[in-house]
């Protein structure tokens, strides 16, 4: 089970920053862009989002709340953009950054999203992004996200337990290779729509395995 990933020998090592592509969406200059690159982060800045697909290859997305998402014509701006990205790419890590205050009405758009204040210094930016990397590279955290999604798809608990065991086996014994997940045996017990959901979820994950 997922508890097998908690043993001392399975302590997660520090993830390499340059393994994780990061997109920053901001219509203004991002002050610490070059400094973060010098600190080892692989970051590209976009002034806005033309569509959701342009962020397909980025496991981490950091978005300003104001001034972006114009093509989507939502008064919620960046918050709406983040919500739509989360629907399409639920296993990515998201952060929204803004000034000292923001309209609390957007809280429903930012469930599970890290909030970063614009006025923090470079040291704090490094900490925030390292936390985002940890969030998407820890195998246990990734499984818990997958499990929540599958529960919402009404996958039965027996199938979930079987998938969890197979997931853990891949982490412990197959170096995180998810090309055959779920296995042919498991596939036959899953609804085709659910199988497609599982395969789409694991397609883009980058786990920090030993």
Question: Which residues make up each language-model segment?
Answer:
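Receiver (REC) domain switch/output surface
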Residues: 121-156
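A short, well-structured beta->alpha microelement
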Residues: 36-57
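Conserved phosphotransfer microenvironments
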Residues: 58-89
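A short, hydrophobic beta-strand element within the central beta-sheet of small alpha/beta folds
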Residues: 80-108, 115
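Conserved sequence signature across two-component system core domains
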Residues: 24-27, 46, 61, 85
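Short acidic, S/G/P-rich loop/turn micro-motifs used as interaction or catalytic elements
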Residues: 28-32, 49, 65-73, 100-104, ...
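C-terminal output/effector regions of signal-responsive regulators
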Residues: 144-210
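Conserved acidic segment of CheY-like receiver
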Residues: 12-29, 36
